[in-house]
C-alpha cells in the first residue's frame, strides 16, 4: 500500500512539473527525472556555479563594476545578488530599478546569470530592508512584541497592509524583469525574502496572533496530515500522533503544548505569507522561486534560533502552505554538510545551496553537493571577498565541474556520485555498476608532506560512470581503488589518462602510469591538484588453473 501511495505521489509530482513547464511564460523552470532535478532555460539544462554577494555590495553600481569581471575570472557562471526594497521603493508606489538594471547589464557583459534575492519584509528575521515609510508607521505596519511587551524591528506576519505592500513591490520587480529580460533570460531564479524566522519567541504573541493560535488548525493542513499520514516526515508525524492524530482542533489539541507547536503555527503563517508574495510575482513573470533558512544550532530552542523558517523538521508545513515556492534551501554556516543536505533532499525537495561560509573547504564541498545530491547549484557567501587559497581552490573546482557539467546535464552517464573526505572521514565506499569503489583522502597514503598534519584539507571528487568499465574521476586530493562485486574476478586498471574537456570533447593530455597510479594499484589525484582522469578497467579471473 505504501509503495502504491508513493507511486501516486511521484506521478502527481511529475505531472505537476510538466504543468509548470507548459504554463511557464519565462521559459525557465525546474524539472525532475527520477531523482535528478534540473534547472532549464529554453529547454537547455543549466548548473549554477555561483557566489552570493555580501549584503551591501549591490547597493552601488560603481562598487559593483569591478566585481563582475573578478567573479568571472573565478569561473562563476551565476551571481546571487540582493534587491533592496528600501532602495527600490524609497517612496510608496515610486519605484527605482536602476540597481536592478545595472546588475543585469553587468551580468550580460560577462555572460553570467543572476539569481535575485528579494530583501523584502524580512532579512535574517529582521525587517531592516523595509522602506523608511514603513518603518516609521508601526500602526499601519505592526511589529512583533516579546514576552515583556517590547516591540522589535520585525514586522508581524499578520500585518495585512505589510503583506499587500510587499506583494505590490515584488510584483513590480517581477514585471520589470519580464519587460527587460524575458528575451535574454539573464535572471534565472528569485529568492523570496531572506532567512525568514521568528526571534525572540517561538511564535508571535500579539492579540491578533493569539486569536489565530487559539482557533482551529486550518482544514488545508489537517487534510494534508490525513492524506499523507504514512509518508509524513517523522518530526511532524510524531507530534501529531502523540497528541492523538486528531482530524481537527486547535493547534495545541492537534500538536500538543510547547515551543514545537508554537513553531509549527508560526511556520504555517510565514509560509502562507511567502506563498502570497511568490504567487503574485509569478503572475507577472513565472521564474523559479525559493526561500532560504538559517539553520538552528545544536541545543537552541525555537526563538533562540530563528524559529519557523523553512527548516527540515517543518518542511511538510512549508510545502503544503507554499505551493508557489519551487524549493526550500539551506544556508550553511554549519560544518555538518551531509546531515543537513540529507534532510533537505526529503519530500522531493530539490537541493540548491544559496549560501555557504566562504572558506577553502567550499572547493571540495562543491563536488560533493553537486555530485551526490544532484544539486541545482552551489554558492558561497560574500564571494567578492574570496582571495588567496580560497579563491584558487574554488576557481579550480568550478573549472573542473563546468567541464564535466555537459556530461551531467545531457545525461550521458550510467550513474554519477560525489564524495567528500577529510581526516575524520578518510575513506568511503560506493557501488557503481558491477564495481565497489573505495575513495580515500590522498593523505591516507602517507606520502605527502601534509599527511602528518593534525588537520587535513577537505578533498572532494565527482565520479561519473560512462559505460560498464569506463569512469571519469574529477576532483582533488583523492585515491580510488576498484573491486569487482564478483569475487571470482579481479579488477585492474587498463588505462588512466589525464584529460580535459572542451566544448564537450574529451582531449587527451597525459597517460598516467607507474608512480602516478602506483603501478596500476589505484587512481590518484594529489592534494592541491585538480584533475579530470579517464579510467578504463578490465577484469581477469581471480584464480587460474
Predicted regions and their residues:
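Catalytic-core region of carbohydrate-active enzymes that cleave or remodel glycosidic bonds
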Residues: 276-287, 313-411
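Polysaccharide-binding and catalytic clefts of secreted carbohydrate-active enzymes
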Residues: 140-315
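The substrate-binding groove and active-site-proximal loops of carbohydrate-active enzymes
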Residues: 48-59, 82-100, 148-168, 254-271, ...
